[in-house]
Amino acid sequence: MEGFLCDRLLDAAQPIAERFRALFSLRNLRGDAPRRALLQAARDSSNLLAHEAAFALGQMQDAEAIPALEAVLKDLSLHPIVRHEAAEALGAIGLEKSISLLEESLAVDPAVEVQETCELAIRRIEEQKNTSGVESATVSPFLSVDPALPAKQGLPVEQLRELLLNEQESMYERYAALFALRNDSGDAAVSAIVAALGVKSALLRHEVAYVLGQLQNKAASDALSTVLKNVDEHPMVRHEAAEALGSIADQESIALLEEFAKDPEPIVSQSCEVALSMLEYERSGKAFEFLFPQTPQVQQES
């Protein structure tokens, strides 16, 4: 199984959705082969696939991947969306030894979204160190390793909204407010999150779209559609909007994904293609990930 999945992930002749199927399957595995394949994919010519591979390594919290992720972060020839995801992955893994490189990239990386991610990752590592074991080990209700711990429980939605939308507030505090609002998930919280699609930071806007995808709330469809349609928006934000629309999956969202699967920006068109493929598997009652019997005959598949 491992060999088949690694080969499928790295086979550039495969449709992008097939490669994503392999990627999503590999992130549930551990060991040298899955790690090597994901790290190789993090330098793929598809920036969408490359950034998703780096994201997966962060979600897996695989400390063995740190040196290669640091090399990705330092490589300015790679797309900012890939460097950003490498920085976020280092923050998710959460080891103090990554702080010095994150500080270096914060100072020298030319892309604002990468700088902001480094700032977040440094703060996340520090917060993890200073937080009680019980609090830092709290699992997200959405089973994701988030770039910031949620703001402390008990803050009213209106206060969290103000924090999230405050352009003078630190990026970490705004992210913390975002995840607290996500965990609340009520109508007022969703309204606050949708409002944040208009903030100045492309990094924060992309995380807002990601969170709306986690929530799968149809109240966000119109705002996400506007983001996807905006060709002047940062590709990483449009990409997350496309994925979020795929998770909401109403008829209008599906029609829009079909339209923008032809977008000239590959990060956007491939996101739509993957989202539509996932929906197709869901409709047919099949898992998007590859599922094998206990003893798969993977050598026979290609």
UniProtKB/Swiss-Prot annotation:
Keywords: Hypusine biosynthesis, Iron, Metal-binding, Monooxygenase, Oxidoreductase, Repeat. InterPro entries: ARM-like, ARM-type_fold, Deoxyhypusine_hydroxylase, PBS_lyase_HEAT. Transmembrane segments: none annotated. The keyword Cell membrane does not apply. It comes from Oryza sativa subsp. japonica. This is Deoxyhypusine hydroxylase-B. PANTHER family: DEOXYHYPUSINE HYDROXYLASE, PBS LYASE HEAT-LIKE PROTEIN. It is an enzyme of class 1 (oxidoreductase). It comes from the Eukaryota.
